[in-house]
Amino acid sequence: MVHTASGREVRHGLEDDDADTICAMATPSGQGGVAVVRVSGSRALEVAEEVAGPLPAPREAGLRRFRDARGETLDHGLVLVFPGPGSYTGEDVVELQGHGSPAAVTAVLEALCAAGARPAGPGEFSERAFLNGRLDLTQAEAVASLIEAETDGARRAALRALSGAFGQRVDGLADRMIDLRALIEAFLDFPEDEDVPADPPELAAEIEALGSELAEIRRRAAAGVRFGEGIRVALVGPPNAGKSSLLNVLSGEEAAIVSAQAGTTRDVVRQWAALGSRHAELLDTAGLRDAEAQDEIEAEGARRARAAASEADLLLVVIEAGKTLDEELRARIAEQAPRPVVVIVNKIDASGDEAGWEGESEVGAHVRRARVSAHTGAGIEALRRGLAALVDREAGEDAWAARHRHIEALDRAGEELEEALVVARRGGQEELVAEALRRAQTALGEITGRVSHEALLGRIFSGFCIGKE
């Protein structure tokens, strides 16, 4: 028996209290043309009929008046019925589609609760879909990721995970671990049986193959985490090179103060923008120059600029046209490898240089170069296209929407495989190999829900929206 995030007790996907029926608004709150109220549970049909009257045939829309227990009309709209177990939650589901008036929605929800439903908790519809076997945990979380997606890349990554591809890959790897464990344990239990190999065949090679598959899964999941969080893009360079102007141009907002006076930016200024298929946090930093020329506040700003550069997924080094990279900037560029760097030559309107984007730079293979004028806009569109291509290439086209908990579980599985490999190469302690494989398999099971704990489910579903998931 498990106490779920909503506080219910469930066993094998079925509620102990069979009469527990939930309702919630499934569309965003506030005024709108249409609002959808969703009802799910063993009494969903009965409860909905109390409010909407005779229900239409399954999956056929019917126009109905919504009434309270006194018969007063609350609203009118369409009703759709989705019988379980073929519904989203695996239970009987009814949707009432009325007008997007907050007062009308509240009245309908109150009438449904008076008829026997209760308000749904955060993520409870997806939670029930998981408990009833309609979704694994990666798919349930992908629903939330799809709702939260702000870029096309994040949308695509969420749909890949929602299709079940992420969970199927993880479960497939776990099954391979089970098979290898079974082989090892058969050898340990029946060492003299001629039908059982005297030694697990190429045990170390088998574990290495599992590790390679795990690394590929982690790569795609880590890319998906970055889709959800966005990437950090730091703008660094000497004072008065035009970093703040570029941040404002790229973000479309006057987020940073622009002045002809050098050293205007003293702290890190943060602004979000879309770069290609990714959401990016642009970090405008204080100018970097010789320590002797800095006061105490400017020195602290430079320290923060260096910290931002070291943590950036993409580094934009901004210099004035006619100037060269100094020793510190060259060091920063070298330290950034293999993460991408773009050297942006700004203020070409004053130098007469031609605007453009260069695919390569003599500074390093991970470095690109652009020539722009933040003042006139020359070269800015080419810069946007170049940055978008860089960002999309780094993200890849095969990412799955993923969460930090997935990465943590994959890393734990990886540590167990490394331990198993060390023991396997040493030989003679196959039982320790089998135990390490079991722990790795358990870690993978937490990703899809094959292995689930009360605290894990509570943490996952409590972060979802009410009604939408």
Swiss-Prot record:
Gene3D superfamilies: P-loop containing nucleotide triphosphate hydrolases, Probable tRNA modification gtpase trme, domain 1, tRNA modification GTPase MnmE domain 2. InterPro entries: G_TrmE, GTP-bd, GTP-bd_TrmE_N, GTPase_MnmE, MnmE_dom2, MnmE_helical, P-loop_NTPase, Small_GTP-bd. It is found in: Cytoplasm. Mg(2+) binds at residues 244, 265. One of its GO terms (cellular component) is cytoplasm. GO terms for biological process: tRNA methylation; tRNA wobble uridine modification. It is an enzyme of class 3 (hydrolase). Keywords: Cytoplasm, GTP-binding, Hydrolase, Magnesium, Metal-binding, Nucleotide-binding, Potassium, tRNA processing. Residues 230-392 form the TrmE-type G domain. Binds 1 potassium ion per subunit. (6S)-5-formyl-5,6,7,8-tetrahydrofolate binds at residues 38, 95, 134, 468. Its main location: cytoplasm. Its cofactor is K(+). GTP binds at residues 240-245, 259-265, 284-287. GO terms for molecular function: GTP binding; GTPase activity; metal ion binding. Its EC number is 3.6.-.-. Homodimer. Heterotetramer of two MnmE and two MnmG subunits. Belongs to the TRAFAC class TrmE-Era-EngA-EngB-Septin-like GTPase superfamily. TrmE GTPase family. Exhibits a very high intrinsic GTPase hydrolysis rate. Involved in the addition of a carboxymethylaminomethyl (cmnm) group at the wobble position (U34) of certain tRNAs, forming tRNA-cmnm(5)s(2)U34. This is tRNA modification GTPase MnmE.
